[in-house]
């Protein structure tokens, strides 16, 4: 009964909210089959991965960088992944006229493929790369088709649009600005272990006074920063919310 009541309350909150902000992490994409790179058995468990994905390594050895980049993110098979029920749910909220912005730590681009229009890619995206000289952009298929992708105009080795270790977060200020405007913050599928994103729930609740909602299979240690906590997969949460009439 309490669980049903929580769903009812959250549904009403979303109906009344003027501005909804959603923070998503790996759990938003694992239901599409994408591995959680930060899990115990994930690719980030390799001690060398941070070095291979660093700005310094790209600058020193761009050809070797691209070899490891493609292996780590398995980009040759990335087309197989499709948006799941959670991605579609957020796009549907937007289609209903809600002012919704997604702040995602994911680099897979599935929110955009799922038709969400207002997405801030905090850690960049695997879907594109660009020429460091002329800034011409290239898509995922171009990266797949070329062992070491180069600009067709300048012949420079492309720069991936993923935020590398050693980079700043170019979208951080835009994310903070949105947090201070929001009525509701929904955190979905993230363990909230990586700063500065881990501070977002506290900012939303303590400084902004927004209603905060957590949807994550495992506890994060930040439950005190949330008004509602759903220890579920995102798909389960969406189905529970959809069942409330």
UniProtKB/Swiss-Prot annotation:
Binds 1 zinc ion per subunit. Residues 1-245 form the Deacetylase sirtuin-type domain. It comes from the Bacteria. Nicotinamide binds at residues 37, 107-108. One of its GO terms (molecular function) is histone deacetylase activity, NAD-dependent. InterPro entries: DHS-like_NAD/FAD-binding_dom, NAD-dep_sirtuin_deacylases, Sirtuin, Sirtuin_cat_small_dom_sf, Sirtuin_class_U, Ssirtuin_cat_dom. It catalyses: N(6)-acetyl-L-lysyl-[protein] + NAD(+) + H2O = 2''-O-acetyl-ADP-D-ribose + nicotinamide + L-lysyl-[protein]. SUPFAM superfamilies: DHS-like NAD/FAD-binding domain. Its cofactor is Zn(2+). The keyword Protease does not apply. Its EC number is 2.3.1.286. The active site is at residue 123. Zn(2+) binds at residues 131, 134, 151, 154. Disulfide bonds: none annotated. Keywords: Cytoplasm, Metal-binding, NAD, Transferase, Zinc. NAD(+) binds at residues 26, 30, 37-38, 105, 107-108, 123, 190-191, 216, 234. It is an enzyme of class 2 (transferase). The keyword Nucleotide-binding does not apply. One of its GO terms (cellular component) is cytoplasm. Belongs to the sirtuin family. Class U subfamily. NAD-dependent protein deacetylase which modulates the activities of several enzymes which are inactive in their acetylated form. HAMAP family: Sirtuin_ClassU (MF_01968). This is NAD-dependent protein deacetylase.
């Amino acid at each position: 009964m309490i669980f049903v009541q929580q769903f009812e309350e959250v549904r009403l909150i979303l109906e009344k909210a003027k501005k909804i902000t959603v923070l998503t992490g790996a759990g938003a994409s694992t239901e599409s089959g994408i591995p959680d790179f930060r899990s115990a058995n994930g690719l980030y468990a390799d001690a060398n991965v941070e070095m291979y994905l660093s700005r310094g390594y790209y600058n020193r050895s761009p050809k070797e960088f691209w070899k490891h980049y493609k292996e780590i993110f398995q980009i040759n098979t990335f087309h197989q992944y499709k948006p799941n029920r959670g991605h579609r749910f957020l796009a549907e909220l937007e289609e209903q006229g809600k002012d919704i912005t997604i702040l995602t730590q994911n680099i897979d681009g599935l929110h955009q493929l799922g038709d969400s229009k207002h997405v801030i890619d905090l850690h960049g995206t695997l879907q594109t790369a660009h020429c460091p000289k002329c800034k011409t952009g290239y898509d995922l298929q171009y990266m797949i088709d070329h062992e070491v992708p180069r600009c067709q105009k300048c012949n420079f080795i492309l720069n991936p649009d993923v935020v590398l270790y050693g980079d700043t977060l170019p979208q951080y200020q835009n994310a903070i600005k949105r947090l201070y405007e929001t009525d509701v913050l929904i955190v979905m599928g993230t363990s909230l272990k990586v700063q500065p994103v881990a501070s977002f729930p506290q900012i939303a609740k303590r400084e902004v006074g927004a209603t905060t909602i957590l949807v994550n299979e495992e506890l994060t240690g930040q439950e005190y920063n949330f008004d509602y906590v759903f220890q579920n997969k995102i798909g389960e949460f969406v189905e529970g919310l959809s069942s409330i009439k």
